[in-house]
Amino acid sequence: MEVRMDTRFWGPSGWRLLHLVAFAAPTLNKRYLLQFFQNLPYVLPCKFCRASLTEYYASDPIPTDTKEFANWLYRIHNRVNGKLREQKLITGKDPTWHNVKQRYEKWMKQSCTQQAMIGWDFLYSVAYTTPCSDVTSTPIPGAPLHPATPELKNRWNTMTIAERLPKLKLWWESLPHILPFPVWKKAWLKAVPHVPKLACGRKAVTEWLYHAEKAMCQELEENAPHDSFDGLCNELNTFSSGCSKIKTTKVKTCRAKKTLKRKSLDRNRTRKYFATGGFL
């Protein structure tokens, strides 16, 4: 069975990192920036999110001018929020562009001592959903028999492992080069000298990222969010979702059932959230 992650687990973490990257875009290596965003729809840890982002890219393509990335991602984020509102999963209004711009530009100006590495929940969710050789993709209901392009295959979740792994490899390769703060990039390139061995499966990739997190946090002289690899795996398993088994067109977002175990982890994560400055 495909493993997918609850969007409430990785979404906030992912959006914060992506928006920071978008605001830093004019200062980043354009080749890696494009490589990162071009492969993003293929690596998201929820098949419905991959499908939606593929559609959003088609109607609002990645800009060629790096100065336009911040506003482009703001529009993409609002499209996602619109989908969630239609599903009655959120009710709030979209923030104004002025408020978003003000918030992230202020963050970009913070000193190095205030720039704790963020995005780990998102990165771990990508790692934990690395496709394995013994798992086949479950097409989204309504999928055509033979989608002709990578975009259509991604839209309908019919990509083979051989087709998806190269996308993941390119994405992981680009990651350190598009980190929004120079201190993060320098620490990652020093502490994490290679990309994960994707063919070894999700456990190996997750373990690689766990060691990367430890090395990064040591390099940045900050506390690591996770105390042990077993504890991390327990947390990821608790927030994994069964959306791969869904055979209806009504559900369009991966969500895990709430359990006592998850509620307990939520409380622990909340404490860590504030201990790390509000970002995981």
Can you annotate each of these PLM segments?
Residues 1-43, 47-280:
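Mid-to-C-terminal functional-domain signal that highlights helix-capping/loop sites
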